[in-house]
Each structure stands twice: as C-alpha cells, then as structure tokens.
Amino acid sequence: MKVAIIQHVIRQDDLNWNLQHVSELMDKQAGADLFVLSETFATGFMAEGTADKAGMQGMMVLKWMQRQASRLNAAIAGSVATRDDDGKLRNRLYFVRPDGFFDHYDKRHLFSFAGETKEYVAGDRRVVVHWRGVSFLLQVCYDLRFPVFSRSRDDYDAIIYVANWPEPRRDVWQTLLKARALENQCYVIGVNRVGGDSACEYQGDSVILNAYGRAVAKCVPGKVDTAVALLDMYELHRFRQKFPVLADADDFLLASEQKFL
C-alpha cells in the first residue's frame, strides 16, 4: 500500500483555489494508492458564524473528491464541513474510492476552545474502512488527544489523523502521534496544514509513522510538501505476532456503544 501525504496551504473560504492547489500537489505523487489531505482542506477551519457557508459547499467538495479519486485511480481522505438532511453541520472525514463509493466518519471530539461545539454536532460512530488490503481507523484533529476512542481492538492496521493543528502545540501533535502508533502497534498517518489564518500559524509536521513509532515518511515542517511511504502489512503483522501487546489490552465498550447492547 503506497500512501501519499499532502501538506498544503489553505486559503480561508477560497474553495476553488484550495482545490486546484491540492490537485497539483496530488499529481506529484501520482501512482499512490491513497492520498491523505488535511482537516477542512477546501475551506479552512470555520469560525463561529461562518460554518453555514461551508455546509453548503460540502456536496461540491465530495463530488470533487470523487472525480479526483477516479482520475488518479486511488482513494482520497480529507475532511469537509457538511450539512445533513437534519440541518445540522458535521466535520466529516470522507474516504472516497475511485468508483465513487465512499465511507465517512464524523468528528467525535469537537474543539470547544475554538467554538466548534457551537457550530457542529459530534459524531458517535467509530469507523474503520478497508482499502486494497489495509484497514484504516478514521480520526480528525482533536480526536488525537483522546486515546480511548482510537484504542485498537485488533481491527485496523493504520490510523488516519487529518488536522488543523496550530504551531504553538506542535510538540503535542508529534508526541501523541507517536504514542498512538506505539500503544496500538499500528501505522499512524498524520496530515496537518501549513500557512496561517486569522487565529494562528500551522507548521504541518505531517508524517507517517510505523508501529515502532519511527517516521517512514515526513514532510518538511512549515513548507508545502508531499511525501510517500509503503505500508508493509507483512512486517506489521509479523511484529504484532512476535510482540503481542494487544492480547493483554483491557476490554472496554465506549458509552455510545452501550445503546446497542
């Protein structure tokens, strides 16, 4: 599995420019099986009072992802602000395949510090997707701080984190990505934006870590960049069998799962 991480600038609310920018960067890694973009890659993180506009653009962005996935014969992962039939906004991570079919995960942990809880509804589903022999757990930005929600049940090979993670907390980003890889014995794909907006600057630090917590691909911090890595499933499963930490993990159910019992 060849995974390309796309570390890109986001112009706030400039949908057409952002989509063209990302498309050009993806072309540099043509041949990848999966392209991972940032959180809200087409618009930027929406502040209070502006998310309604982004919600109207959600379907446009999804259709663009479907066209790009078909053109590149690859899956594409990235989050957008979207409005469902219930009228509520969600920070939705789409995983789109070349045939147009897609899965989605709605961000579970909303960033109340930045007002996300005032605009969006939190998701309640834990989502694992399967693509070309690899299983991915989908996560968005702030979810990284809550390890119980991403705890492995031996049901995925890699975690995808897409983010708008600010530069002042870059050490947290780097530390927690490594922790998630080590504790879950999995690959971790973390993609963050670069540039700035009215709130802060973003350093990127996009990376792919293996189950040993070592970087197998990384983008240049603070720069528009792309990187690619091969996910080696044979080596991952060999490591898990040789050092079976997950067999000793605690059993648990998330609160949202109790209602299904």
Task: Give the residues covered by each predicted segment.
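Short beta->alpha transition motifs characteristic of CBS
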Residues: 43, 50, 94, 105-111, ...
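Extreme N-terminal starter segment of soluble prokaryotic enzymes
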Residues: 1-5
